[in-house]
A protein has these predicted regions:
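Glycine/small-residue-rich hydrophobic helix-like segments
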Residues: 182-186
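Lipid interaction determinants
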Residues: 15-174, 187-246
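Beta-propeller blade signature
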Residues: 177-181
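Sec-dependent N-terminal signal peptides
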Residues: 4-13
Length: 246
């Protein structure tokens, strides 16, 4: 009887340890150097890495995609890479290590500190732009997931959006920085923006509303003019548009 209980305990511990890294990895991880800031955003589904020089308003690179964890490795399926489009639609196994409050991912991304804990907000997660609002109502795109994809991650108090084509492997643009959201007000402090470096450092405030899996994002663009966008949770978009998901 004792042997059975011991085996059940060991089995339970092994299961919890194998599941633990996924939860530990999720969040925003940051490393600040003299002229470079590296931010890794990790959800249960996606990882995004971005590096930039906020002082000089220079974007350095971004890459990322979907992932799973297996035997101490982060198995990445690249969806975008600003520096090397040949990586797109390929996979890589990247070792990771967490010690205390710091993450090391592979050989080059070391000693990133976990971002501060923030209240869980209703915008946290991964979103795909799916349409725009006009006087006539909501106009949804025929297929917001393929081949071109514009995605936004909100993790902790950081955000990143990235636009890319998963068929041609072309990277278009990206932007990111710090964010807060609560009670229908969403604010961004822009840390990098490939389209318009003049926007870096700006603090923007928008209104937002959640309707099911849709997020209505309204306000003024950092480059001027109004926006009234619909973003939809990626999981829902995948169920609708990802080949083989139905």
């Amino acid at each position: 009887m004792r042997k059975i209980i011991l085996l059940l305990f060991i089995s339970s511990m092994s299961h919890s340890l194998s599941a633990q890294p996924t939860e530990i990895l999720q969040g925003a991880w940051v490393r600040e150097e003299k002229e470079k800031k590296t931010v890794i955003l990790i959800t249960d589904q996606l990882i995004s890495v971005a590096a930039y020089n906020e002082k000089e308003k220079k974007f350095l690179y971004t890459w990322g995609g979907s992932y799973v964890l297996h035997e101490g490795q982060l198995q990445l399926q690249y969806e975008w890479s600003s520096n090397d489009s040949n990586l797109v639609n390929t996979s890589a196994s990247i070792p990771f290590f967490i010690k205390g409050n710091k993450l090391s991912l592979g050989e080059n991304l070391t000693e990133l500190e976990r971002g501060p804990a923030v209240p869980s907000g209703d915008l946290q997660g991964v979103w795909i732009i799916s349409g725009t609002y006009t006087d006539g109502g909501l106009n949804k795109r025929p297929n917001p997931f393929l081949p071109r994809r514009t995605m936004k991650l909100i993790v902790g108090d950081y955000f990143q959006w990235v636009s890319y084509n998963v068929v041609t492997k072309k990277f278009f643009d990206a932007g990111g920085g710090r964010q807060t959201h609560a009670k229908g007000v969403y604010s961004e402090e822009i840390g990098y923006f490939t389209k318009a470096t003049a926007s870096v450092g700006k603090k923007m405030t928008f209104t937002y509303a959640i309707d099911g899996d849709d997020w209505r994002h309204s306000g003024q663009k950092s480059t001027g003019g109004q926006l009234d966008e619909c973003w939809t949770r990626r999981r829902y978009i995948e169920l609708q548009f990802k080949p083989g998901s139905n």
